[in-house]
Amino acid sequence: MIVDVRSYTAHPGLLPKYFADYAAGPFAVQTRHLGQPRGYYMVDTGVVNTTIHMWGYKDIAERQAKRDAMQADPEWKAWLARNAGTFVAQENRIMKAVPFWPVAGHPSGPYGLVDFRLYTVRHGKLPELLKLYETEGWGPQSKHLGNCVGYYQSDVGGQNQILHLWGYKDAADRSMRRGAMQADPAWQAYIAKAMPLLQRMETQLVVNAPFFKP
């Protein structure tokens, strides 16, 4: 399974109008071709005026076929023309699920706030980090944080990266859960081994778009 992670930054003040216009019709057109998104978010803390949406596919071939059909749809073409000029930047990356995720029986919602965490791993160290996390990190982290919305590794785009998303009720819930995790000796032992393997860590807090119900 792969996920197309798409990040669009709008001109200041235009994102609410984009969401309203998109929800009124184009969302139905897009989901008719691509299926339901795995996430459709608005950045709350991070790169503001940005929407992040994630679409799942069986493989690259399925993604191409579905997107080709969507791009040929007259309703979608009309929407693209109406929406031209809304965004100042658009980027996407293709990622694949890590071998140990999804986990059967793991909580899957509901959530109102998502911690969107992108880590860049030192060159050549990604397999080592994933193995270490699977054996020593996943247990304490999932015990304390609970709702893992997704856990992916880079495929097309930026390389040597992992993306993991954690759902929370709100900011207070996030602070409480992360505080408990960071105080756990098992997590502290994992972090001591993992930090030398990491090159860069970024996080954004995102909320669900008005029309997206996880």
What is each PLM-predicted segment?
Residues 1-214:
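Short S/T/G/P-rich N-terminal loop/turn motif that feeds into the first structured element of a domain
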